[in-house]
Amino acid sequence: MNVQESQPAQAAPPPNKKSAVLVIDDEPSLLEVFSAALSPHFEVTTASSVREAEFILHKNPFKVVIADHLMPGGNGMSFLVRAREEFPHMQRILVTGYMKPEMLLRSVNEAALFRYLLKPVSVAELIKVVQDAAKLHDQSVLAG
């Protein structure tokens, strides 16, 4: 009798299961807009500070995290750099109202961002970017 041992492969989530997304911004109105835009497509959790986001991130798995750059009590870029170290498959998106070349360079080199979005962000662009990020997360997990 020939018995083959096989390792269980990590499967992609079922098609009906929404991908988990964490959105961090200190502006309640933007959190509300982002959540309303993304909720039909994703399981959205919001945080209004870096400290709150760090707590949430360690309690739940997320495929994608979206962070505002400048927030009181911490900045989104530093948060995303730490998140990359702890959760390398999780895709990171930085949203900001301004762009400085050195910040763009740091975001690419240190945080390995999936995308860098300038405010104002259109709802269609936001949804598309998060969908693409969630797909890349799944491919990254499957690839090991």
Regions found by a protein language model. Name each.
Residues 28-46:
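Two-component/phosphorelay signaling modules centered on CheY-like receiver
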Residues 46-64:
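Acidic, metal-coordinating helix/loop segments flanking the phosphotransfer/catalytic sites
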Residues 48-49, 75-78:
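Acidic catalytic/metal-coordinating carboxylates
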Residues 55, 77-89:
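Short amphipathic alpha-helix used as the core "switch/output" element in two-component signaling
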Residues 121-130, 134, 138:
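C-terminal output helix
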